[in-house]
Amino acid sequence: MRYNERELLSLSRQPAEKAAEILMRVPKKGSVLKKRLVKLVVNFLFYFRTDEAEPIGALLLEHCRITKEEENVFSISFIEEPERKYCFECDSEEQCQEWIEALKRASYEFMRRSLIFYRNEIQKMTGKDPLEQFGISEEARFQLASHKQ
């Protein structure tokens, strides 16, 4: 997927949901762990050299797996390219778990499923569809796959 470089640069400058300097290894042969500033903004994980303001890369956190590896280490791999695996080593196990949880919550699919879940809970409690007032209650993106019309 291609992105507009200026838009990505602008997005990388937005406030981060989570940011830290951690060790990172990219999926290149012979790659070693390097200290990077890693910044989660919406569903993008930007990574920077620690002394630079512009990102050197960005990962779109869709269709990916966030996996706990050994102690203090997690990885991100992509479902359609499992060999493309990024590894991150945190300072502590607690920091590692916080990153894993934040990254799993960052995807559009997670947000969509959460919206559907809470929509159904509100509907059970009130008897009303909370999206109806916005005229979007029948849109496919707000339906579970089995309920799409």
From Swiss-Prot:
Record-level GO cellular component terms: cytosol; early endosome; recycling endosome; trans-Golgi network
Domain called PH: residue spans: 15-108
SUPFAM superfamilies recorded: PH domain-like
GO biological process, one term: receptor recycling
Disulfide pairings: none
SMART domains named among the record's database cross-references: PH
Protein name: Pleckstrin homology domain-containing family J member 1
Name of encoding gene: PLEKHJ1
